[in-house]
């Protein structure tokens, strides 16, 4: 069966490839001038390309799909691919021609004057999406950017790749810059690796998607060179509502309150529903390559051997799985009433019944007041996310202040202050084989539940003894019951983070501007990894690991810039500056093993 499935996958892939062809063309403006860096994306997907310096593109598509062509400052255009192999597109000018992009070191440039690809994602595409992670809200919105989750649990880490895998051992994630200051978005690895099942969140979580004004993704090397080594993997610029004064309120003061509720359902593998556990169509309380058919009219009692008791029109009945648990102290006297009883051999849909619908509630408040000489903004956000995996949850609170003003002496000042509290808990998720977690350090809830045979009543069988030990259907009790894992093992994080900026700028004359910006980012993180004794996977004698970490990053930047608009088509810009960055880290950890009594965690 395994080899048949692999063959079918390759066969279907080949059939899909034959249905595709390559479409080429040029994307230009109304005057016929090519648009370098324009985005061409297959509608409804994350697949796409960008045009080269001459506006040329080439993309493999199927007939009948829609291609969306877009470029900053122009109206997007959607075209259905017919039988043609060439599509030349002329984009009309939109209402964003005067839009500026905050580029390296906080410099504002008109989007059309840039010599590299920039993709802008507005707040309307980020807000109220039921996703607490800013990086995940960008999924499918930026061509060429690959965004993946480390796991499917709520609050787990996110990987963002712009330029492909440029490093084998180092990070491939781009630099995130929030309101002009580099922002630490790493996934903490102090507590262990994903291979060991430590499911850390990313610090993208400390940003509130509902407080973001826009996101600019800088892809080209020229766009990121001013950030040096930090920008080697690309740069993602985030402008928050607290840090942006570019959109004054017509009413003077605006208050926006919003709430959203989303339900999440797991997407599970496709399971067959005709056969139970066994080997070569012979019944057994284990899994290998499939036991007898569930239909009594098809199977033969001889397939069940000594397990067989009786059958009726609907089911075959066998001896209870706990009749065969080798360690009788797990069964007797506690579950002695089950010994000798009959057990229906049927499809229990244990995997599907293990998960519950997840529920995400998000509430946000934004107050904005602006006038002739400045603005003030306050934001508040709260996310309560109950994951569909048992005992997985995310609680997040964000609060932010920001403002800008022009003083009488002409000096412009601005500042932001943000606080984030993130509380994240999940069962451990280690890499797994059919026999359980590959890690000697921890267990794996997905590994244990996904390999459950269809004939095992996962949600009906007892899963824990009175003294706290895991019990499951296999005679050797050598796989940990995932229900036991959900209640007795966890990874948890509690993060308190304060970050903000202060900036000042002064126009020496019409061409020269002197500017200074200070940024601070302080993160305090307490992490726990725990499992009660009595399990099977990982550390069966119990483990409790904790780590305390404090990371502080301070950034100072000074710039002297020159800007002269020579005529309607030509401008001259120059910049000289200095940047200083200081990062401090302190941490400690403890590991406690060989738990003396059951059930203390």
What are the roles of these predicted feature ranges?
Residues 193-195, 500-506, 520-522:
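Alpha-helical support elements that line or immediately flank enzyme active sites
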Residues 369-374, 407-409, 504-513, 568:
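Short, solvent-exposed loop/edge-beta patches enriched in aromatic
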Residues 1-8, 15-400, 404-407, 412-414, ...:
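Short, small/polar-rich motifs associated with maturation and membrane association
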Residues 6, 105-107, 346, 503-513, ...:
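N-terminal capping/interface segment
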Residues 142, 509, 596:
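Acidic-histidine catalytic/liganding microenvironments
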Residues 112, 172-173, 245-344, 387-392, ...:
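Surface-exposed loop/interface segments of Gram-negative outer-membrane beta-barrel transport/assembly proteins
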């Amino acid at each position: 069966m395994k080899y048949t499935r692999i063959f079918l996958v390759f066969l279907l892939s080949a059939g899909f490839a034959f249905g595709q062809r390559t479409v080429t063309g040029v994307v230009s403006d109304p005057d016929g001038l090519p648009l370098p860096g324009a985005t061409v994306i297959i509608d409804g997907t994350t697949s796409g390309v960008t045009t080269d310096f001459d506006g040329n593109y080439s993309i493999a598509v199927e007939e009948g799909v829609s291609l969306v062509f877009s470029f900053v400052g122009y109206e997007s255009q959607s075209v259905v691919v017919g039988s043609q192999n060439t599509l030349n597109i002329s984009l009309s000018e939109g209402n964003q021609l005067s839009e500026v992009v905050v580029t390296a070191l906080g410099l504002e440039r008109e989007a059309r004057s840039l010599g590299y690809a920039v993709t802008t994602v507005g707040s309307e595409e980020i807000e109220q999406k039921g996703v607490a992670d800013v990086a995940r809200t960008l999924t499918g919105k930026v061509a060429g950017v690959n965004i993946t989750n480390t796991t499917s649990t709520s609050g787990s880490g996110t990987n963002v790749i712009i330029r492909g895998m440029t490093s084998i051992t180092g990070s491939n994630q781009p630099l995130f810059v929030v309101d002009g200051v580099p922002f630490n978005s790493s996934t903490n690895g102090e507590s262990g690796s994903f291979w060991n099942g430590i499911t850390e969140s990313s610090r993208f979580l400390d940003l509130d998607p509902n407080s973001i004004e826009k996101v600019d993704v800088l892809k080209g090397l020229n766009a990121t060179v001013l950030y040096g080594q930090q920008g080697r993997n690309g740069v993602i610029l985030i402008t928050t509502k607290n840090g942006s004064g570019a959109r004054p309120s017509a009413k003077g003061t605006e208050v926006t309150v919003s709430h959203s509720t989303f339900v999440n359902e797991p997407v599970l593998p496709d399971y067959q529903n005709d056969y139970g556990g066994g080997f070569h169509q012979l019944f057994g309380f284990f899994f290998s390559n499939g036991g007898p058919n569930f239909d009594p009219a098809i199977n033969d009692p001889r397939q069940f051997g000594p397990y067989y008791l009786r059958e009726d029109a609907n089911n075959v009945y066998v001896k209870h799985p706990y009749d065969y648990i080798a360690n009788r102290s797990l069964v007797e006297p506690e579950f002695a009433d089950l010994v000798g009883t009959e057990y229906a051999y049927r499809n229990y849909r244990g995997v599907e019944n293990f998960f519950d619908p997840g529920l995400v509630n998000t509430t946000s408040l934004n107050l904005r007041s602006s006038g002739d000489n400045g603005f003030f903004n306050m934001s508040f956000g709260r996310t309560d996310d109950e994951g569909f995996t048992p005992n997985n949850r995310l609680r997040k609170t964000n609060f932010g202040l920001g403002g800008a003003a022009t003083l009488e002496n002409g000096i412009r000042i601005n500042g932001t202050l943000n606080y984030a509290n993130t509380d994240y808990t999940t069962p451990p998720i280690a890499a797994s084989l059919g026999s359980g977690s590959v890690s000697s350090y921890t267990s794996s809830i997905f590994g244990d539940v996904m390999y459950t045979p269809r004939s095992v009543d996962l949600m009906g069988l007892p899963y824990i003894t009175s003294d706290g030990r895991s019990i499951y259907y296999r005679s050797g009790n050598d796989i940990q019951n995932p229900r036991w894992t959900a209640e007795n093992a966890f990874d948890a994080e509690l993060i308190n983070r304060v970050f903000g900026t202060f900036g000042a700028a002064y126009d020496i004359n019409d061409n020269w501007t002197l500017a200074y910006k200070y940024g601070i980012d302080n993160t305090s993180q307490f992490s726990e990894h725990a499992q009660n004794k009595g399990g099977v996977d990982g550390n069966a004698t119990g483990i409790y690991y904790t780590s305390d970490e404090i990371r502080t990053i301070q950034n100072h930047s000074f710039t002297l810039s020159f800007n002269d608009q020579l005529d309607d088509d030509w401008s001259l810009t120059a910049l000289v500056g200095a940047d200083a960055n200081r990062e401090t880290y302190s941490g400690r950890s403890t590991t406690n093993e060989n738990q003396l009594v059951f059930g203390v965690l």
